[in-house]
């Protein structure tokens, strides 16, 4: 019996040859833990300013397309375009995105940075789509989490309840949020978050439930349908003129016509 590395070729051999094969145990036993990964890699983005972190989140999709065109290197880190097997220490775009979100949430502990994040993130399309009110630090932290990989971030200490409550909200309100279940399974995402919490033996005690209820109260006060109304108000003066041409009396607020 021979032990080999887990590669595409060795898998083919496993399935097609009669000889006994085993994969090297170190490859089987090394499990990915984002909490550990986060502690080991946060320094890689320490030079990023708060504004730069927010710019990354606002332009996430465009940045992802560029990064995934080829191997992308920054500092000592390389995100590979293709990889037969992603290792526990390898950087990926999703892991980088999660690192930046964790970094930003931590920055909300500083009042000056909190105010900066609050003012800048309000213009992000996803925050407007959720109709999320930005009234305090907790609501700003929720804003930072929107669009992030909740199963990854849930493994980081103190991020458990914000992750699970947001996952529940997305599952409950996926239609209002315009989430296509074929592209993003909210129930599956919630299950992954809970699996992460269970694996770290996280206990939802009274204090944690209280924290969760605070996040839930903020989310329940959001209005996912407000984005269109906000945009309409922006053009209300001009749009009302056209309404008048169709015989509709001009109103103080365009939304009152609905």
UniProtKB/Swiss-Prot annotation:
Compartment(s) where it occurs, according to its Swiss-Prot or TrEMBL record: Virion
Pfam families attached to this UniProt entry: Tospo_nucleocap
Positions in coiled-coil regions: none
Keyword Transcription regulation recorded: no
Keywords tagged on the record: Capsid protein, Helical capsid protein, Ribonucleoprotein, RNA-binding, Viral nucleoprotein, Virion
Bilayer-spanning residue ranges: none
GO CC annotation: helical viral capsid; ribonucleoprotein complex; viral nucleocapsid
InterPro entries given in the database record: Tospo_nucleocap (IPR002517)
Family: Belongs to the tospovirus nucleocapsid protein family.
Described function: Encapsidates the genome protecting it from nucleases. The encapsidated genomic RNA is termed the nucleocapsid (NC) and serves as template for transcription and replication. The NC have a helical organization.
Subunit-level organization: Homotrimer. Binds the viral genomic RNA.
Record text about domains: The N-terminus and C-terminus are involved in homooligomerization and play an essential role in viral RNA synthesis.
Protein name: Nucleoprotein
């Amino acid at each position: 019996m021979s032990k080999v590395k887990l590669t595409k070729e060795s898998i083919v051999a496993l399935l097609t040859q009669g000889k006994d094969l085993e994969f090297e145990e170190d490859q089987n036993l090394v499990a990915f833990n984002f909490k550990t990964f986060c502690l080991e890699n946060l320094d890689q983005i320490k030079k990023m300013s708060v504004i730069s972190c927010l710019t990354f989140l606002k332009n996430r999709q465009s940045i992802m397309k560029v990064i995934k065109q080829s191997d992308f290197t920054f500092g000592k880190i390389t995100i590979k375009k293709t990889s037969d097997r992603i290792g526990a220490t390898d950087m990926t775009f999703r892991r980088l995105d999660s690192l930046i979100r964790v970094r930003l949430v931590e920055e909300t502990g500083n009042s000056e940075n909190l105010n900066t994040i609050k003012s800048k993130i309000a213009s992000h399309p996803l925050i407007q789509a959720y109709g999320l009110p930005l009234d305090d630090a907790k609501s700003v932290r929720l804003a930072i989490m929107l669009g992030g990989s909740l199963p990854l971030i849930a493994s980081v200490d103190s991020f458990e309840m914000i992750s699970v409550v947001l996952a529940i909200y997305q599952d409950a309100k996926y239609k209002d949020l315009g989430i296509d279940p074929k592209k993003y399974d909210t129930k599956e995402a919630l299950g992954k978050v809970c699996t992460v919490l269970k694996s770290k033996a996280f206990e939802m005690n009274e204090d944690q439930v209280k924290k969760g209820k605070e996040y839930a109260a903020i989310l329940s006060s959001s209005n996912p349908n407000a984005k269109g109304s906000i945009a309409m108000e922006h053009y209300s003066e001009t749009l009302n003129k056209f309404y008048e041409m169709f015989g509709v009396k001009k109103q103080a607020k365009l939304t009152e016509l609905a």
